[in-house]
Amino acid sequence: MPLTVNCPICKAPVEWVPQSAFKPFCSERCKLIDLGDWASEKHVIPVKAEFDPEAFDEFDLDEGDFFKE
């Protein structure tokens, strides 16, 4: 018996088999709704937004000499 998952959009059951063209979605409609949510930034991948000056420490660069040639 194949694995069955719920569509992330409408919660309809979807069989996880090669013939399921839109898995994990149940249809192209649900797939496009999810794509639209990503495009409109309803879904985002969290990132550290602030600059970390300590990131330069691993390169042993002095900030005063950073842009000198």
Swiss-Prot record:
NCBIfam families: PRK00418.1 (NF001638)
SUPFAM superfamilies hit by this protein: Glucocorticoid receptor-like (DNA-binding domain)
Statement: the UniProt record of this protein carries the keyword Electron transport: no
UniProt keyword list: Metal-binding, Zinc
Subunit text: Interacts with GyrB.
Cofactor note: Binds 1 zinc ion.
Cofactor requirements of the protein: Zn(2+)
GO MF annotation: an example: zinc ion binding
Function: Inhibits all the catalytic activities of DNA gyrase by preventing its interaction with DNA. Acts by binding directly to the C-terminal domain of GyrB, which probably disrupts DNA binding by the gyrase.
UniProt GO BP: regulation of DNA-templated transcription
Gene behind this protein: yacG
Keyword Metal-binding: yes
Tree of life domain: Bacteria
Amino-acid positions noted as binding Zn(2+) in the UniProt annotation, renumbered to this chain: 7, 10, 26, 30
Coiled-coil annotated spans: none
Family assignment from sequence similarity: Belongs to the DNA gyrase inhibitor YacG family.
Entry protein name: DNA gyrase inhibitor YacG
InterPro entries: DNA_gyrase_inhibitor_YacG, Znf_NHR/GATA
